[in-house]
Every structure is written in C-alpha cells, then in structure tokens.
C-alpha cells in the first residue's frame, strides 16, 4: 500500500475509532444515569460480557489473523475465484460453529451464568434476570462474528471506512435503547434492562445489513459453500488453532476475574 492510500486508511480508521470512543463514553454515562446500580445493571453487564468474550475468539483476533493472510494469498496466487471460494467455505464453517455454540449456550445458560457470576445464586431475582438477558443477548455473537468476518474481506480489498464504523453503530443503538429504560423504570430487573438487550440485537442486525450491502455493491459477498477443506482452507484453520490458543487463555483469565468480582 502506497503512502497516500495508507494515510487515507489511517484517517478513516482513526476518525471512526475516535468517534466510537466518544460515543462509548456517552453510552456509559447514559447507562449509569438511567440504569443506575442494582440488579438490572448487574444482570445486563454480565449478559453483555458473554457474547463479548466469545467474540474475541470468533470475530476479532484469532479469526481475522488467520483468515486475512490466507484470503490475500489465495487472491494473489490463485485468483479472485479461489479467494472467494475460500471465503465462502470459511463463512459456512464459521456460521455452523456459531449456531451450534448459540444452541449450547441457550440450553445451558443457567450453568454458564452460575460460572460467570456465582454470587448471583444468593439473589434468585438477579440470577433469573441475568439468565433471561443472556439468552436474549447471546445471539448477538453470530451477528458480530459475521460482521467481523465480512469486515476482514473488505479490509483485504482496501475498504476500511465501513468496517471502522461498526462500533459507532453499536454505541448509537445502545444509547438509543438506554433512553427507553425510564419507560420500564417500575418493572422488574429483567424487564427494566430488556430495552438494552433488544437494542443490542438491533445493532447486530443493522451492522450485518450495512456490511452486507458494502460487499454486495463491490461484488465481494462470498457465496455459501459446503466446506470441502481443501489445502488452503485446512492451512487457514490450522493457523486459527494456533492463534486461538492465546485468545482462549485470555478469556479464561477474564472468566476467573469476572467470577471473583461476583462472588
């Protein structure tokens, strides 16, 4: 990448990151003012942690680090069709894994919340609220994972602006959902925080729609392909396995930290 496109990419990513950080601060202030401290806040924050933990593994970091070099190499050495075939197989495999993970998570959510926040067992209302909210927010995981996967394809093509705007969409939708909290101010904890959980899913759907539109417009949207695990695909997943080791260790540490906080 020459100096001029590199500078433009830096401005785009840096600008969107700065806007996202400001909106993230606004989001936290609005949460504190409208949701406050209590069972609703505790339950929602634990529910929000769950998809974010898995996202580090399936969306950011390990997956991107493994896929982007493989996609760029296939594009350079074997042509556009081979690169898009790799992307299509990876997309299908990733989606199948994520759907299975969501099904398992939804089924065993009480045990998962008991692991993340063992102290909630002493207050059944808080535990039940966290379980319900986590079941609502957990489907955000495949949404944001596919968004990050599509963003990696766009980035490999030198298109950074839309991908960098994804956190901005997330924060705007969450702030909007927070302003619905006063409507539920007299409700139970789970119902009081439900506007935020719904806003999270809306953010995921909007992020998917925006990224999908970009890829379709630029003819970069991968087709769904049944995985055949050819040599480039196997090499990519081997790289993912290596890269995920560090991410898994980090997430285990975060789970331990979160469990200690909520003892």
PLM regions: where:
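Membrane-embedded alpha-helical bundles of multi-pass transporters/translocases
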Residues: 1-261
